[in-house]
Design a protein with these regions (language model features):
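Sequence-level preference for short, compositionally simple segments enriched
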Residues: 2-316
Length: 316
């Protein structure tokens, strides 16, 4: 395995993360060891098999500030999918012990502001903080069709849609509107899901858009926390009619609305979307609408086992 080091003080092979990633040949398995510091960079990482390892989420920080409403260098608005701080693609990705942040600010000012755009076929995030406001984490792929002109403008807007399997463990993910969204299959274990109070009427944690036969987003043993007013945050709304989110054995703060989930305006057929829950605890646990499925113990165990098989990294 190729190992390269990044240090802002000049003691490493490179002084920036982008330079280090660019130096890695696509086909070579590589570890990029990133030292402490705030790296103000917009990163594109497209490698076959790469690990980015920081010195700790509070020590190694990758930060950028593009927002969907802000102007792009081509004269058009940046839009959602060019706003990323980090874009990841390739076959196998692992990110550990660092923060990836989009600090463009709240959506009212900056628009959608993606911290991590994850398009790798298989991706693992361990002990990572993903911080932002609107649209913090995009779990690719995109839906098949955009609803607005230039809505999918970005690195994969015209590419064939390919499934991805993503695994997040011991991470913190923060934002306010649809801050975990997309069509990927993703399992979140032992994570803190933090809704930021940007003084808006309602917030939404997930906005899935996956396939009818896909897994969607599964959360297990996570803490949903916030300083938002009680009952003002929904666990999810379907970005596309067949979106799926399941919340299993999680602790829900008082900010979670009693309904739990909500339709996406009048565009949602709740008969197609799949929202499910099992054994939620805390002030945000409540009786849900009939279209939110309450899983039995065996059903929840089966779903979790399937999610782990699909999304957890394979043993060598």
């Amino acid at each position: 395995m190729l190992t390269v080091t990044v240090a802002q003080d000049g003691s490493g092979d490179f002084a920036s993360i982008a330079e280090a990633v660019l130096a890695v040949p696509y086909e070579e398995e590589a570890l990029v060891q990133v030292g402490p510091g705030i790296y103000r960079e917009k990163l594109v990482c497209e490698k076959r098999c790469i690990t980015l390892r920081g010195a700790g989420a509070d020590k190694t920080k990758l930060v950028w500030g593009d927002g969907g409403k802000l102007p792009h260098k081509d004269g058009r608005p940046t839009h959602t999918f060019r706003s990323y701080t980090a874009f990841f693609s390739g076959e196998t990705l692992c990110v550990e012990d660092m923060t990836i942040e989009n600090d463009a600010g709240p959506g009212a000012k900056a628009g959608q502001a993606v911290a991590a755009y994850v398009d790798s076929t298989r991706a693992v995030f361990r002990r990572v903080k993903l911080l932002g406001s609107q649209d913090t984490l995009f779990c690719a792929p995109l839906p098949e069709k955009e609803r607005e002109k230039d809505g999918f403008l970005g690195p994969r807007g015209l590419a064939p849609r390919k499934p991805t399997a993503q695994y997040y463990t011991d991470c913190e993910i923060a934002g306010d509107i649809d801050f975990i969204f997309g069509g990927g299959d993703a399992l979140f274990e032992n994570c803190v899901i933090r809704t930021v109070d940007n003084h808006i009427s309602h917030s939404y944690v997930t906005a899935p858009s996956g396939r009818a036969d896909g897994l969607g987003f599964v959360f297990w043993n996570c803490d949903f926390v916030s300083d938002c007013p009680p009952g003002s945050v929904y666990l999810g709304r379907p970005w596309r009619p067949e979106g799926k989110t399941a919340v299993l054995d999680c602790r829900l703060g008082a900010h979670i609305a009693p309904e739990g989930f909500i339709a996406w305006n009048d565009r949602t057929d709740t008969g197609l979307a799949s929202f499910a829950e099992a054994d939620s605890t805390g002030p945000g646990a409540a009786e849900r609408p009939a279209w939110v499925k309450q899983l039995s113990g065996p059903e929840a165990a089966e779903l979790l086992a399937h999610a782990r098989t699909l999304c957890r990294p394979k043993a060598n």
